Amino acid sequence: MAIRKLLLLLKPIDPYPFLQTEGASLIKNPQVLQYLESRCKVHKNAIKFCQEILSKKPVEWKPISRNDLSHPIRDVDMVITVGGDGTLLHASHFIDDSVPVLGVNSDPTQAHEVEELSDQFDASRSTGHLCAATVENFEQVLDDILFGRVVPAKVSRISLKLNSETLLSHALNDILIAQPCPAAVSRFSFKIKNKDGASSPKTVNCRSSGLRICTAAGSTAAMQSAGGFVMPMLSRDLQFMVREPISPGSTASLMHSTFKPDQFMDVNWYSDHGTIYIDGCQVQHSVQLGDTIEISSDAPVLNVFLSHGISQIRSRY
């Protein structure tokens, strides 16, 4: 398919508005302020650069702030996000499997900066795990796409049903089901079932701080930080982990595992209240005592241009 019409989705140009308020005076370390101001400047310059490159290409495009995005994205051939993984995650909730997306990391972490400032504060910037481009290679990556030298990867997302009703939001990274108060105990049970009707032999009853399920793309995020393992990016499996289980006993080995595309997880919620957090704070749904939640990889895939695929294609030229 020829790509002629693009949407440029932007992280807010001023991502740190508090720098313009009196609150900024509470930051005593001047290097912190310089670092934050630098991040704003680098991001603004990246937006300007991407717009200049697009203006030279035979495409129609328009920019929009991610804060102004409120409806499904249609009638475009591709979405380009400029920001970090959070901006691409935000975009994913408005994109189905018909529109590919390219992420541009506008402010990548600088290893030398992190090292120089490590004794003062964390100077990490944007990881950009899902972003295939930066300012350094944006034009080359864009040309690879426009000339059809690279195709997007089909990345799995999580489908959710709440009391048998399908939720419209699909998680690209992960979901967390937990109490609204992080200090409260979550009570629930789950069972892995096959879509042909068979189920695992054991229902797992849990008291814990919640249940996290991730896709392959999300396995490098919170799941890995919690002790999970990194999955191949194109895997359709889902990984789950019960967070901080209380006295799991004989079910300890069942608290962290995976399930296949021909399976789903059936969760029964036994606390008074709960929340399904989809891709961090992107989307939330409330649950209550007695609710059932069905989790699977049945959601439409997201077509994402990944750096690995682009580097493979480029090595042929």
Swiss-Prot record:
Query: Main site of residence?
Result: cytoplasm
Return the SUPFAM superfamilies for the record.
NAD kinase/diacylglycerol kinase-like
* Mechanisms controlling activity: Two-fold decrease in activity in the presence of PPi, iodoacetate or para-chloromercuribenzoate.
Q: What is its EC number?
A: 2.7.1.86
Any GO MF annotation of the entry: NAD+ kinase activity
Free-text tissue specificity from the UniProt record = Ubiquitous.
**What biological-process terms (Gene Ontology) are attached?**
NAD metabolic process; NADP biosynthetic process
Give the EC class as a word: transferase
Q: What is the superkingdom listed in this entry's lineage? A: Eukaryota
State if NAD is listed as a keyword.
yes
Keyword set for this entry?
A: ATP-binding, Cytoplasm, Kinase, NAD, NADP, Nucleotide-binding, Transferase
What is the pH dependence described in this protein's record? Optimum pH is 7.9 at 25 degrees Celsius.
Query: Which GO cellular component term is one of those annotated?
Result: cytoplasm
Q: Which InterPro entries match?
A: ATP-NAD_kinase_N, ATP-NAD_kinase_PpnK-typ_C, NAD/diacylglycerol_kinase_sf, NADK
Any matching Pfam family: NAD_kinase
Q: Which reaction does it catalyse?
A: NADH + ATP = ADP + NADPH + H(+)
Q: Where in the cell is it found?
A: Cytoplasm
Functional note:
Phosphorylates specifically NADH. Can phosphorylate NAD with a 100-fold decrease in efficiency compared to NADH. Prefers ATP as nucleoside triphosphate substrate. Can also utilize UTP, GTP and CTP. Key source of the cellular reductant NADPH which is an important antioxidant factor.
Quaternary structure, per UniProt, is: Homodimer.
What's this protein's family per the entry? Belongs to the NAD kinase family.
| Protein name stated in the entry | NADH kinase
Source organism of this protein record: Arabidopsis thaliana
